[in-house]
Amino acid sequence: MTNIRKHHPLAKMINHSFIDLPTPSNISSWWNFGSLLGLCLVIQITTGLFLAMHYTPDTTTAFSSITHICRDVNYGWIIRYLHANGASMFFICLFMHIGRGLYYGSFTFLETWNIGVILLFAVMATAFMGYVLPWGQMSFWGATVITNLLSAIPYMGTNLVEWIWGGFSVDKATLTRFFAFHFILPFIITALAMVHLLFLHETGSNNPSGISSDPDKIPFHPYYTTKDLLGVILLLLALFSLVLFSPDLLGDPDNYTPVNPLNTPPHIKPEWYFLFAYAILRSIPNKLGGVLALALSILILILIPFLHTAKQRSMMFRPLSQCLYWMLAADLLTLTWIGGQPVENPFITIGQVASIIYFSTILILMPLTNLLENKLLKW
């Protein structure tokens, strides 16, 4: 058996990636989220495939096909809610994974980090297009508002929006192409995840201390397969609790109303995992400025390795940076809350202050704090 595992071309690849992989002996539970993201992706592709068997991407039947899935298809309701809430779990794991990378300095693996940022964009695009497919009120108006942002691009904006719509408004052509892209993107994400792992295994994993773990490695199996299994059980417990007890907790009630282009919902808002970026978009009165801030709120992750001025990689022994990090985490939670509130005072002011704190913390305060810590630690 060992012979096959170590010499068969396919088994050898799996062996080097998941069984005999040399892994730092001190990585904490924060390193579990990579495997949990893989699990989420498998859940999403599987449930999505079964949903696609019954869904019809047509403006006249899309909403009723979702109703049909929930009422008439065997266990259709659980497949639908696993898919919807699985997306929320995906983003929780994604934010934790990125947060761990920021805290422990994993962004110094440049290729792995940049592929990760591309993956984040791909997952966000997939989730956005998936939100349009049920063809409820929030699906339609969310699609209209978010795609309309591209009209802020000078000279070519309006043409670009109409090209994406496939007409002069969000309609049948838009729904059909969003379904096609929503179906294909998870497979592209899978390919990108493999590239992400390929680059990671070139350098080996980081660890909480941030120093080289070459002298102290252990095999991935059985130590970390067992540890990952605990994460898997906890994730599935949380997901099934959500699906079976409160499946609509994270959804929007407006999406249970079929599309009516003549009736705008009082508060148009995306799913909870986009609210922080949506709050940044809304905090700037100028349309183009808002769109640029929205894009930069995610693209700023690419700059982080170049803004890292500390001599120590991890924040584990840097208390000042830790304070800033948790301030940034609290700020993102504030932005998420503001994104779900109506556009009126005091929410407008809070959103603007939180947006300024977000950008200034990453671009100014963190690099300066790193330099100060270098001085204090006499590097």
Swiss-Prot record:
A ubiquinone binds at H201. It is a multi-pass membrane protein. GO terms for molecular function: metal ion binding; ubiquinol-cytochrome-c reductase activity. Its main location: mitochondrion. It comes from the Eukaryota. Keywords: Electron transport, Heme, Iron, Membrane, Metal-binding, Mitochondrion, Mitochondrion inner membrane, Respiratory chain, Transmembrane, Transmembrane helix, Transport, Ubiquinone. GO terms for cellular component: mitochondrial inner membrane; respiratory chain complex III. The cytochrome bc1 complex contains 11 subunits: 3 respiratory subunits (MT-CYB, CYC1 and UQCRFS1), 2 core proteins (UQCRC1 and UQCRC2) and 6 low-molecular weight proteins (UQCRH/QCR6, UQCRB/QCR7, UQCRQ/QCR8, UQCR10/QCR9, UQCR11/QCR10 and a cleavage product of UQCRFS1). This cytochrome bc1 complex then forms a dimer. Belongs to the cytochrome b family. Component of the ubiquinol-cytochrome c reductase complex (complex III or cytochrome b-c1 complex) that is part of the mitochondrial respiratory chain. The b-c1 complex mediates electron transfer from ubiquinol to cytochrome c. Contributes to the generation of a proton gradient across the mitochondrial membrane that is then used for ATP synthesis. Heme 1 (or BL or b562) is low-potential and absorbs at about 562 nm, and heme 2 (or BH or b566) is high-potential and absorbs at about 566 nm. This is Cytochrome b. It comes from Galago gabonensis.
